[in-house]
Structures are given as structure tokens and as C-alpha cells.
Amino acid sequence: MPTVTWDHIHLRSPDPEATAAWLQDILGGEIIRGPGRIDVKLGGANVFIAPVNASDGVNSPPVTPYQGLDHFGLTVKDIDAVAAEIKAKGVEFTKEPTTIRPGVRICFIRGPQGISIELLERDRKYA
């Protein structure tokens, strides 16, 4: 079996600057400018954000449920405090913080261009 590690997620956005700013302001990412795109270091991986224009012939995001990438998840410490902090910044929650099983609490937020982002907190004693 090959050994793999996460390197990046590549997003396309009609406003890469705004998308990068959101990832920085809401999730604490570090903006790094790359050739032809903006990169954001986030949680040990990179988010590449390339521009897309309406004239590029790109389809709108599909209505859920659909096949393909559904969301990406990020671990946090003290999910309730994080949720309160980002809610105060106006972030839309599609699922409020909840316990899904002992030791695991999650919530879902709506990111730029409707991206679904899961925040989760794991209590290692249940791992």
C-alpha cells in the first residue's frame, strides 16, 4: 500500500481574495500568494484558490444531495467556543454543534461559494 498524506484542496472562486480572506478571518488560515492563485495554509494542509469567471463555462454548485465531494472536515479544540466565536462573525451554520457519539462533537458551516465545512472535536479517550 502507498503511504499518502494530505497536500492540498483546490478551490475555484469568482473572488479568490474574498475566499482567502474568509478562510483567514474565520478559520485562522495564513494567506500565501502563489503564481496565478492565492494559497491559504490551513490546519497543516494548503488550500489553493484559483480564479473562475462566469465566461469560463463553469456550472453552479449542484443541489444537495449529490455525488462527489460533500464537505471537508477540520478538527478544533473546544468546538462550542469556536462556534460562538465564528457565529459572532456572521458565519452561517447548517448544523449546530452536536454530539454524534461519545467523544465526538461536530457542526457544519457554510463557507464561500456554499462550500460545506465540518468542524469536529474528538476526545482522544474515546479513540
Feature map (PLM): residue ranges:
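Vicinal oxygen chelate
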Residues: M1-T5, E30-G73, A84-R110, D123-A127
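Conserved active-site tyrosine of GNAT-family acetyltransferases
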Residues: T19-Q24, I86, G114
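Short glycine-/small-residue motifs
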Residues: L119
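Histidine-centered catalytic micro-motifs
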Residues: I9
